[in-house]
Amino acid sequence: KQTNTFLSLEKRHIDDLIPLCLNGNRHAQLEIYNRYYKGMYNVSYRIVKDSTIAEDVMQESLLSALTKLDQFKGEVSFGAWLKRIVVNNSIHQYKKRMKRQEVDLGNVMYKVEDNDGYVPDNGMIELKAQKVIETMKLLKDNYRISLTLHLIEGYDYEEIGEIMNLSYANCRTMISRAKES
């Protein structure tokens, strides 16, 4: 019977899984993890630029989201709420690591990757994408992070300002300057 319950969870909408998680259903929690871990890892990796740290941030963020699920009010989608947790934790970890200066920024590979891992065949598209990636690696950290959040993750200026503790005007200016750089 448990196998049938577990399999049926795969077809359930996220809004049906949340109440099960709140009641401590481990299968529902695992299903949420399975649905979101790849995407959240990629979000974190784009910010922290280290696969081990991104893995840790993703797991800590998912655990945090599941333990604080009662605070989820449904004002945004669960995925957007979880993504915000991952972004905030990723930025926190990145800043913490930079303070300790554990990594030489010049040696860190920054790679933009689709959630499904698709790599285009077209050589020209790949060449342009590689040029964009190389250019973004050269940007100051605040420019790189704000551009990543805006262009890749799809956050608007207000959300980025909130995440990075900037006013709306300063956020727009920073992104504009980052694009010019």
Model feature map: region roles:
Residues 42, 56-63, 76-88:
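Structural recognition of an alpha-helix C-terminal capping motif at a helix-to-coil junction
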